[in-house]
From Swiss-Prot:
It comes from Baumannia cicadellinicola subsp. Homalodisca coagulata. The keyword Hydrolase does not apply. This is Large ribosomal subunit protein uL11. The keyword RNA-binding applies. GO terms for biological process: translation. SUPFAM superfamilies: Ribosomal L11/L12e N-terminal domain (SSF54747), Ribosomal protein L11, C-terminal domain (SSF46906). Forms part of the ribosomal stalk which helps the ribosome interact with GTP-bound translation factors. Keywords: Methylation, Ribonucleoprotein, Ribosomal protein, RNA-binding, rRNA-binding.
Amino acid sequence: MAKKVQAYVKLQVAAGMANPSPPVGPALGQQGVNIMEFCKIFNLQTENFEKGLPIPVIITVYSDRSFTFIIKTPPAAVLLSKAAGIKSGANQPKKEQVGKVTYSQIREIAEKKVADMNSNNIEAISRSILGTALSMGLIVEG
């Protein structure tokens, strides 16, 4: 018989840097999950990501206090910031530009994000990421 799901916990945790301090500790401690076990497994599974990159994770907690988790790809805004070499987006995106990205960089990000998006069409995903880039105040070339 399948285990009964107690809760779903959504977090963004830095790749390879999960530790029991907030936000991981309190979120998982509330559910009675072994926090150190999660941190150890998460860090092992994210060691091929760039260290410190925020990784969304969805943790399924079962009634017997066991858990499973799904690691998603980093948010598009983080990947765009990295591609443009900026720390954050513009305060007023329509009025100020903070950096430049090329359409090929956007397409590359779309290919990374295809597993997490609700479409398999690379062009549609590219347009979605293009919208994110524009709302961050980035100029798209090409």
